[in-house]
UniProtKB/Swiss-Prot annotation:
It is found in: Nucleus. This is Mediator of RNA polymerase II transcription subunit 19-B. Its main location: nucleus. One of its GO terms (biological process) is positive regulation of transcription by RNA polymerase II. Component of the Mediator complex. It comes from Danio rerio. The keyword Transcription regulation applies.
Length: 240
């Protein structure tokens, strides 16, 4: 490979193998040997007398152009409600009157929040439209001026008395669930009814109860824990 390259460009073999930059694969460019004349390309050959294009023109920069992107209709300036024809839905949901007051949703906020702020001049719009007139410099408050900020015991105004009282909760009546009718009981057979009647008769028989009591008494007399048996033992031992 080196012999072929040296024969083409007239370089001796002592320079070593050509690197990638010499072959045109790297960042560098192959050096044109001085012995060889200017290279002519087929498309550069023209008639005699016409100016020949220089080979250096091939190394000039060039630009690639493409079509510009289409303009997007949706921008930050467009109104999406009118773009998607949602004006009717917007007016339907935003113009709906709410039955419940604002205090029901925000019970912990102090003050009368149900009434508009225009009545007592506490709205933020009033600060924007009519800002308070004040000096540029701030001066500390004196002791006489601080007396107006002291808290004094006294009755609360009527509008603040019911501030901490929560409205009574509505009692929801429990709905009684209607039970489904159970399956009808099977009719009693005559054998079952006779057996139940016999049990009732046995329980209600007074003679039977007396017999049970007598049996219990006899068992208690013959048992060693009976007090009569313990008292009879020393008498028998004394007779012996």
């Amino acid at each position: 490979m080196t012999e072929i390259f040296s024969s083409l460009y007239g370089q001796p073999d002592s320079q070593g193998p050509a690197g990638p930059s010499a072959l045109g694969f790297g960042s560098g460019k192959p050096q044109v040997p001085q012995n060889m004349g200017p290279m002519c390309f087929p498309h550069q050959m023209m008639e005699e007398g016409a100016p020949v294009r220089k080979p250096a023109a091939m190394n000039e920069p060039f630009y690639l152009l493409r079509e510009l992107p289409m303009e997007n209709e949706l921008t930050g300036h467009t109104n999406l409600i009118t773009h998607y024809n949602l004006e009717h839905a917007y007016n339907k949901f935003c113009g709906k009157k709410v039955k419940e007051k604002l205090s029901n949703f925000l019970p912990e906020l102090p003050g009368m929040i149900d009434s508009p702020g225009i009545q007592d001049n506490s709205s933020l719009r009033s600060l924007i439209e009519k800002p308070p007139v004040c000096n540029n410099s701030f001066s500390p408050l004196t002791g006489a001026m601080l007396t107006g900020f002291r808290l004094h015991t006294g009755p609360l105004p009527e509008q603040y008395r019911l501030m901490h009282i929560q409205p009574p909760k509505k009692k929801n009546k429990h709905k009684h669930k209607h039970h489904r009718p159970q399956d009808p009981l099977p009719p009693e057979t005559p054998s079952d009814s006779d057996h139940k009647k016999k049990k009732k008769k046995k329980d209600d028989d007074p003679d039977r109860k007396k017999k049970k009591k007598d049996k219990k008494k006899k068992k208690n007399r013959h048992s060693p824990d009976h007090p009569g048996m313990t008292g009879a033992q020393p008498s028998t031992s004394s007779l012996r």
